[in-house]
Curated annotation (Swiss-Prot):
Natural source organism: Thermus thermophilus (strain ATCC 27634 / DSM 579 / HB8)
Enzyme Commission designation: 3.1.-.-
Protein name, entry field: CRISPR-associated endoribonuclease Cas2
GO molecular function: metal ion binding; RNA endonuclease activity
UniProt cross-references to InterPro entries, sorted A to Z: CRISPR_associated_Cas2, Virulence_VapD/CRISPR_Cas2
Length: 94
């Protein structure tokens, strides 16, 4: 079964909802920035997470975006900073 590679970013003016979103997403992926997470999920896990996100997000006040990355793009990820973060590969491409 192919895994899905996701980048999830959100913004909400509500502190309580922001904390709940962070707690939910920590259970599915790794925090990369304050409101940005990366996740590697099965389709079943994604369906479960999607349902929880739809129930939590206020469509009138919040913004949440999920970016689906192809597997080959994940191997070409480049990051600087935070020693604890894993570098997936060190690409030399333009």
């Amino acid at each position: 079964m192919r895994e899905l590679y996701l980048v999830i970013a959100y913004d909400t003016p509500d502190d309580r909802r922001r904390a709940r979103l962070a707690k939910l997403l920590k259970g599915f992926g790794e925090r990369r920035q304050y409101s940005v997470f990366e996740a590697r999920l099965t389709r079943e896990q994604w369906a479960h997470l999607k349902g929880k996100l739809e129930a939590l997000v206020n469509k009138e006040e919040d913004v949440l975006a999920v970016y689906f990355l192809p597997p080959e793009a994940v191997g070409r990820t480049w990051r600087i900073g935070h020693e604890g973060l894993k570098r997936l590969e060190d690409p030399d491409f333009v």
